[in-house]
């Protein structure tokens, strides 16, 4: 089946509403490109010497993260106090002092980093996160006694949760339409698989262009955008990298711990060092990550259980499942090697993603059933009219 319109009628002039839609569309495209460029910029910048966060060797010979060295973000506008701490290391017969590079304001962030990633993502998110920590604990400069440290650590967990909730709301706005029309998007993907199967053995440029035009026509016919699904998938990534940078470099989180679990330490690194308490983090994270990534496909398979799929559609669904499993393992490998605070952020993010996926699934099922009932009602009404 072809979704191309053979009609060559002249296009009518665009209305103001249509022009407005085009403007919004291009703003979204430029916004998406800005986010993508910022993310890539940040990925490179985080590992440059002046922005890297390194462990120091303490007096016992143990490698640890500590405030007052390397790159650090201090939220002075929230009353946070911090400065360089003089740590030295003995190497090759000489003593060397660890470097220190601090940012204390939003203006300074743009001036020193000249980076949209740190300016628009890292510092504002760090300010919100640290502000919530201060709201719950009353301070960003906790005392060293166990009670104060525990209160501060628990406050940091709550702050990460609320920040995750805020980020989820922002990223959901990028893919709201595709989420609200999740069932339609899944049906479109099956139809796209059929179109791709139709042109599978055709390698000439004309056939490839025709395939792309058919796919575009299909999305247009269903009043859906290919971009919305793509933007929804990429939107969380800059915030994930921002949280990674924040947990490692923000003083407020460098000093945060809940009992023996420090938010800046990597769980896998600590487990291999004999601190098995960090297994708790991975035991919570791993199943949640698996469920959050596989749930959409599993729900789709459940819904389409009674539907007879074409061979191309079966292959497409299998390919989709394999890709999700691969992505799941990639995320698992990445997350277990980063700071515990990032793992906690991703635990909350996975929980919210599971709730979001299932909520939209229930919404779409309810909408589908209501539509079926309405169709049945109209059919019965037409039958009664025909009998008369």
From Swiss-Prot:
Example GO biological process: protein insertion into membrane
Membrane-spanning ranges: 22-42, 116-136, 156-176, 227-247, 279-299, 328-348
NCBIfam families, per database record: PRK02201.1-5 (NF002570), yidC_oxa1_cterm (TIGR03592)
Coiled-coil residue spans: none
Location of this chain's protein in the cell: Cell membrane
PANTHER family given in the database record: CYTOCHROME C OXIDASE ASSEMBLY PROTEIN COX18, MITOCHONDRIAL (PTHR12428:SF65), OXA1 (PTHR12428)
Keywords, comma-separated and alphabetical: Cell membrane, Chaperone, Membrane, Protein transport, Transmembrane, Transmembrane helix, Transport
Subunit structure: Interacts with the Sec translocase complex via SecD. Specifically interacts with transmembrane segments of nascent integral membrane proteins during membrane integration.
Family: Belongs to the OXA1/ALB3/YidC family. Type 1 subfamily.
Superkingdom classification of source: Bacteria
Protein name per the record: Membrane protein insertase YidC
GO molecular function, one term: membrane insertase activity
Gene: yidC
InterPro entries tied to this protein: YidC/ALB3/OXA1/COX18 (IPR001708), YidC/Oxa/ALB_C (IPR028055), YidC_ALB_C (IPR047196)
Database matches in Pfam families: 60KD_IMP
The protein's role, per its UniProt record: Required for the insertion and/or proper folding and/or complex formation of integral membrane proteins into the membrane. Involved in integration of membrane proteins that insert both dependently and independently of the Sec translocase complex, as well as at least some lipoproteins. Aids folding of multispanning membrane proteins.
